[in-house]
């Protein structure tokens, strides 16, 4: 097997510090579970990073977890936690945890770490993901790769076989470009890592068209506008789910504000306020409990984005606004505590469109002029199951002037537990031909609003009523 090219090219300069390395072969390479990939400082020969390919990337089967608390608190401090100064897998709080025998990297300051794929094979190319935040500006590095890493590979065992130099200085200003070829950063994560926590200054991240196979996680960010060059041209995706990156054994996640965060999404913003995302696609490549996008925070706005997930394709916690979006999922397609306001958005779901978990302190999910497209016979609008003795009696879902396609006549269900206070309200629903839907067979828990309920309808058409008078619209 012959090496055709590398990225960076040998002795190439002006490389982003968040670069993903690439080797192109003359045939599709076979990755072995042995050998090392090592990165050294060219001038000092100091080891900078090491990937041990004998370590599996992450779990491939579900783990049976003991009963755990949902409400374990989590401290969102602004700390400079990276792979350079902290061992991935360190505990940020006191809880029992078994040793982690998988690949781990710290992303976005999450010291517990994420399982990741150090090498991803794409056709005849091997994409090599280093541990995050280890390369520095103004340095030259060389790469050594054991011949055992790939079948039929001669290896790279000398200093000038694969070397490159990073950009001389960190980009300045408040606007950064993500681009594989000529950007300030190679990855979305790299650009966001460059933005300080809790900033009052507005920052802009512009993403050029391309495929970005990366797990994105950031926390404590404020006032960032993330814009893709085009919705269909920018794809940010990763193979992640609850199996591959499960919550700790004795902790459950995201049940209340300030509790331990999940690690199973492809793109996750955590304790973030005033974030705008537009004109891009986020996607998880795995099935199961697997969010394409997971949002924790306040005053976050999304426009013209495509979210592709499996179960829980979108988890949305805290006041958030969605306009002209597409959300594809495989059941409980929208999960979370809310409140969330959706306008002119299309939902495609193989199972129930949502499982709402809001409490009485805030609204749930409200949809105005949206499209619900059921992809199988079980695509009810909402289900409210009993979750091991836990239910959400104040759940709220309101549909106003929405189009429903292949949604069961019952509309809502299964509904378990106390539902007397649930608000499952609907007004003006029509089919794809514009005809009024016959709602005579709707679940008795649901309420069909009439024209005489105009005051209620007008309130729910106002995002401020749903998200709060202090919600800051950024679109």
Regions found by a protein language model. Give the residues of each.
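Sequence-level preference for short, compositionally simple segments enriched
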Residues: 168-475
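Acidic, low-complexity Ser/Thr/Gly/Pro-rich repeat segments typical of extracellular/periplasmic
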Residues: 2-170
């Amino acid at each position: 097997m012959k090496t055709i090219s590398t990225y960076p090219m040998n002795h190439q300069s002006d490389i982003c510090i968040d670069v993903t390395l690439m080797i192109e072969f003359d045939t599709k390479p076979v990755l072995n579970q042995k050998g090392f990939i090592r990165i050294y400082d060219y001038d000092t020969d100091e080891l900078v990073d090491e990937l041990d390919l004998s370590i599996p990337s992450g779990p491939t089967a579900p783990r049976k977890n003991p009963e755990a608390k949902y409400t374990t608190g989590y401290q969102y401090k602004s700390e400079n936690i990276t792979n350079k100064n902290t061992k991935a897998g360190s505990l940020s709080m006191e809880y029992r945890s078994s040793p982690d025998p998988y690949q781990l990297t710290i992303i976005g300051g999450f010291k517990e770490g994420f399982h990741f794929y150090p090498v991803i094979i794409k056709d005849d190319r091997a994409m090599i993901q280093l541990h995050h935040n280890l390369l520095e500006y103004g340095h030259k590095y060389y790469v050594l790769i054991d011949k055992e890493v790939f079948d039929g590979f001669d290896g790279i065992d000398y200093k000038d076989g694969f070397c490159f130099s990073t950009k001389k200085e960190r980009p300045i200003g408040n606007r950064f470009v993500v681009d594989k070829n000529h950007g300030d950063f190679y990855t979305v994560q790299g650009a966001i890592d460059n933005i300080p926590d809790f900033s009052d200054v507005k920052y802009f991240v512009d993403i050029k068209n391309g495929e970005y196979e990366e797990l994105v996680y950031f926390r404590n960010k404020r006032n960032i506008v993330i814009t893709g060059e085009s919705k269909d041209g920018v794809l940010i995706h990763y193979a992640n789910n609850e199996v591959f990156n499960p919550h700790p054994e004795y902790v459950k996640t995201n049940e209340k504000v300030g509790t331990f965060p999940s690690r199973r999404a492809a793109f996750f913003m955590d304790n973030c306020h005033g974030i705008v995302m537009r004109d891009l696609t986020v996607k998880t490549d795995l099935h199961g409990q697997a969010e394409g996008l997971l949002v924790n925070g306040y005053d976050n706005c999304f426009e013209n984005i495509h979210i592709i997930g499996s179960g829980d394709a979108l988890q949305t916690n805290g006041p958030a606004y969605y306009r002209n979006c597409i959300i594809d999922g495989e059941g409980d397609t929208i999960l979370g505590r809310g409140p969330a306001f959706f306008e002119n958005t299309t939902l495609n779901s193989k199972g129930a469109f949502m499982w709402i978990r809001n409490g009485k302190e805030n609204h749930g999910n409200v949809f105005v002029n949206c499209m619900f497209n059921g992809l199988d016979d079980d695509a009810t609008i909402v289900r409210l199951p009993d979750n091991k003795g836990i239910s959400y009696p104040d759940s709220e879902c309101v549909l106003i002037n929405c189009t429903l396609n292949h949604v069961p006549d019952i509309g809502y269900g299964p509904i378990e537990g106390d539902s007397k206070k649930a608000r499952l309200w609907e007004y003006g629903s029509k089919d794809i031909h514009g005809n009024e839907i016959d709602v005579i067979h709707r679940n008795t828990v649901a309420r069909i609003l009439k024209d005489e309920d105009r005051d209620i309808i007008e309130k729910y058409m106002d995002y401020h009523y749903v998200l709060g008078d202090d919600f800051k619209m950024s679109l």
